[in-house]
Amino acid sequence: MDKILGKVPMGEKIGYSLGDAAANLVFQMMMIYQLKFYTDVFGLEGAIAGTVLLIARIVDAFVDPAAGILSDKTQTKWGKFRPWVIWTALPFMVFYVLAFYNPGIENKALVAVYAGISYVLLMSLYSFNNTPYSSLGGVMTGDMKERTSITSIRFVAATVAQFVVQGLTLPLVHKFGRGSGADDAQGWLSTITIFAVVGFVFLVVAGFSAKERIALSLIHISEPTRQE
């Protein structure tokens, strides 16, 4: 019981928080720049690009619960949730890059198909990584003050990543691009690759740093009214 309710080392909290920083390097990019990338780089019409994003959101509504169910049923010596954070880190970041990669297809219908498939797979991997990651924070300790501390540090990491994406994306695109405009495909690819490498390292650190100290059954018994 002392282990369950004990303090979580600061290094573990910071390591875990890097997972949210990684997620926001992806999430903020999708929210702010994905549509712009589709129209400026892929050359898709706004309505088509918007439809691609809408379809992905609909698919994601089914993927999220599936990710939660599968991670909850996982049983390994590392726990339920840590393995998913580590297992999905590489494919998650690979499809992050592919979602902002211009394959050089001239047929706009095929471009739309590529955009749809790559974005749906990216969103799916986001769910299979971030859903277990979020659940992991709830099993690191049974101490509510410690959970609040973990959440606070995680929020700071996410906010920093948000500012990085908002403040550095276009300058990096211009720096690495072969041309001078924000529509340069090489600039986008180089920028996203940098973010993806950083995100991969952060997720691996988060997965290996955090420790699952309590079982979900204990959470449900001790906190019957707790809402996620």
Regions found by a protein language model. Name each.
Residues D2-L218, S222, R226:
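Membrane-embedded alpha-helical bundles of multi-pass transporters/translocases
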